Amino acid sequence: MSILNQAINLYKNKNYRQALSLFEKVAEIYDVSWVEANIKLCQTALNLSEEVDKLNRKAVIDIDAATKIMCSNAKAISLNEVEKNEIISKYREITAKKSERAELKEVEPIPLDWPSDLTLPPLPESTNDYVWAGKRKELDDYPRKQLIIDGLSIVIPTYNRAKILAITLACLCNQKTIYDYEVIVADDGSKENIEEIVREFESLLNIKYVRQKDYGYQLCAVRNLGLRAAKYNYVAILDCDMAPNPLWVQSYMELLAVDDNVALIGPRKYIDTSKHTYLDFLSQKSLINEIPEIITNNQVAGKVEQNKSVDWRIEHFKNTDNLRLCNTPFRFFSGGNVAFAKKWLFRAGWFDEEFTHWGGEDNEFGYRLYREGCYFRSVEGAMAYHQEPPGKENETDRAAGKNITVQLLQQKVPYFYRKKEKIESATLKRVPLVSIYIPAYNCSKYIVRCVESALNQTITDLEVCICDDGSTDDTLRILQEHYANHPRVRFISQKNKGIGSASNTAVRLCRGFYIGQLDSDDFLEPDAVELCLDEFRKDLSLACVYTTNRNIDREGNLISNGYNWPIYSREKLTSAMICHHFRMFTARAWNLTEGFNESISNAVDYDMYLKLSEVGPFKHINKICYNRVLHGENTSIKKLDIQKENHFKVVNESLSRLGIKKYKYSPLTNLNECRKYTWEKIENDL
């Protein structure tokens, strides 16, 4: 296994490319599962540098001004002061134009013909309103799936601390629960004989032992090792020094059994168990609840009140109804005492093994859960007691570790933490704050102008994601020619499947938390993203922000300003498509829906924004931020008969999702170009 040792040493010395090559050889010779995590670490480390390498190989003159400056700031390309200032001046000139205000007219927010007895269900009180989410699942026409409640797999990562681990295991022997559970001790290469401790409990617990070699602080890797060994559909992570109270398993499982879309967070208290052995806890089942609280040695994670350390999160739990009213709940997701459905590992990904120092990895993992649509809830009954190490002993320097991981966290968690940067200091980020998605089909004449308008925004923390939907013209070739090596542009090509499929593919390619929609023949005003982003930052509960547009011809000449309904209301959107370009929504809101409908060719956007309107509030900006090119081939003005049919279809499907059965949205006339409607009341036969 000398080849493996060589690979590990190369990785430690940051020679990632050679390390990757050797890890891949190990996979060929032995088993890919041995080095799967190592290969991923190398690929992650190489990702940004490879993008920069590609940029260096491409003529810098072809890259947009903002990207040049960001690469220069990151020392990826060399620019002298004169060159840099010239490019900054060019960028400011390109982005100087401000969006025009749209003409306003007085309107009623709720249409006058809206039925007086038709009430739309309330929206959530926050983006994390798990009570609202539970009620949404109960709606008659909402898709249901039978939960398989098989048990809880408890993963306990450990490095040494055999005595403390034994006490934690003893407390797991004392659980009062109707649910099955297993314990998986995941050893991060301890020097102490952890396996011997596990054997002590083989007759008392359903327990497993897994181990990896000591490669330094590898908490994420050892958590993943334990999670891969889990046999149940529900998993909990419990640090080895976190002794659970007797109702810990029951408190978690009785909630997970009701809703597997909620990740649960247990609070902690700080105690000293150094005067006890695990036998004391086996013989006195309530002992863990009786030991007095103390002041912790960990000055990073705790705060002191009344001569004892308290969990800093508890006050926030109380103020937000156990996080139900919190718009950033992932910030309180501490991996030492949590539980969730295992399905989320396959949706959001596993713990990020690039975190090799103390802190931050649980927030990053929690952010990915949140972005994917998971809810969070604190559970008082899942209290665990943090056992302080004797003599202030600690295997990791937490404060120093946090100084390192906070930088990685800022790179990988754009939402909430990330602030706007000035162009003079802006750099490329591992995970951008904003993604602009573009479904593209036969748009070779317009695609470069389209993409450049997205890159030349006053917000630079942004990427562009494109799905070429099997174009038969030069669209794909042009994308490859202009953007194959661009660090802020990603594109993919697929067989022609229609606008719904191309939109879904492009959105799934997006890494940002905020996602903007741009059609491939249109282009943005330079401040479009910033205007929307400002509204999102003012109100974290927003699911979507949209502006208005102007219609232009192929040459860019003004035809007319676009239709603009100046005030958003759910009732108006349920009656007519008022949510026009430019539109931005959160990735979380989109993940709470079924995505774009791939079975229809028209009214695809109307359907999508009705879905988004069902999961969160919208905000309208009365500014013209979007240029819509009318060339006769636009899907919204072709095949008017199908467009009309789908228009009424998607509204009625929205009503069905909302559990509204007493009204049907019906066309008033048979004319294809007519969108006049009537609310048809459906009499109940019962």
Swiss-Prot record:
Catalysed reaction equations from the record: 3-O-(beta-D-GlcA-(1->3)-beta-D-GalNAc-(1->4)-beta-D-GlcA-(1->3)-beta-D-Gal-(1->3)-beta-D-Gal-(1->4)-beta-D-Xyl)-L-seryl-[protein] + UDP-N-acetyl-alpha-D-galactosamine = 3-O-(beta-D-GalNAc-(1->4)-beta-D-GlcA-(1->3)-beta-D-GalNAc-(1->4)-beta-D-GlcA-(1->3)-beta-D-Gal-(1->3)-beta-D-Gal-(1->4)-beta-D-Xyl)-L-seryl-[protein] + UDP + H(+); 3-O-{beta-D-GlcA-(1->3)-[beta-D-GalNAc-(1->4)-beta-D-GlcA-(1->3)](n)-beta-D-GalNAc-(1->4)-beta-D-GlcA-(1->3)-beta-D-Gal-(1->3)-beta-D-Gal-(1->4)-beta-D-Xyl}-L-seryl-[protein] + UDP-N-acetyl-alpha-D-galactosamine = 3-O-{[beta-D-GalNAc-(1->4)-beta-D-GlcA-(1->3)](n+1)-beta-D-GalNAc-(1->4)-beta-D-GlcA-(1->3)-beta-D-Gal-(1->3)-beta-D-Gal-(1->4)-beta-D-Xyl}-L-seryl-[protein] + UDP + H(+); 3-O-(beta-D-GalNAc-(1->4)-beta-D-GlcA-(1->3)-beta-D-Gal-(1->3)-beta-D-Gal-(1->4)-beta-D-Xyl)-L-seryl-[protein] + UDP-alpha-D-glucuronate = 3-O-(beta-D-GlcA-(1->3)-beta-D-GalNAc-(1->4)-beta-D-GlcA-(1->3)-beta-D-Gal-(1->3)-beta-D-Gal-(1->4)-beta-D-Xyl)-L-seryl-[protein] + UDP + H(+); 3-O-{[beta-D-GalNAc-(1->4)-beta-D-GlcA-(1->3)](n)-beta-D-GalNAc-(1->4)-beta-D-GlcA-(1->3)-beta-D-Gal-(1->3)-beta-D-Gal-(1->4)-beta-D-Xyl}-L-seryl-[protein] + UDP-alpha-D-glucuronate = 3-O-{beta-D-GlcA-(1->3)-[beta-D-GalNAc-(1->4)-beta-D-GlcA-(1->3)](n)-beta-D-GalNAc-(1->4)-beta-D-GlcA-(1->3)-beta-D-Gal-(1->3)-beta-D-Gal-(1->4)-beta-D-Xyl}-L-seryl-[protein] + UDP + H(+)
Gene name linked to the record: kfoC
InterPro entries in the record: Galactosyl_T_C, Glyco_trans_2-like, Glycosyltransf_2, Nucleotide-diphossugar_trans
Entry similarity comment: Belongs to the glycosyltransferase 2 family. CS/HAS subfamily.
Function of the molecule: Glycosyltransferase that catalyzes elongation of chondroitin, a polysaccharide composed of a repeating disaccharide of N-acetylgalactosamine (GalNAc) and glucuronic acid (GlcUA) units, by alternatively transferring the GlcUA and GalNAc moiety from UDP-GlcUA and UDP-GalNAc to the non-reducing ends of the chondroitin chain. Each chondroitin unit has the composition beta-(1->4)-GlcUA-beta-(1->3)-GalNAc.
Ligand binding (UDP-alpha-D-glucuronate): 441, 469, 517-520, 581, 603-604
Region (Galactosaminyltransferase): 130-417
Organism: Escherichia coli
Domain of life: Bacteria
GO molecular function: glucuronosyl-N-acetylgalactosaminyl-proteoglycan 4-beta-N-acetylgalactosaminyltransferase activity; metal ion binding; N-acetylgalactosaminyl-proteoglycan 3-beta-glucuronosyltransferase activity
Cystine bridges: none
Official protein name in the record: Chondroitin synthase
Annotated positions binding UDP-N-acetyl-alpha-D-galactosamine: 157, 161, 188, 217, 223, 239-240, 361-362
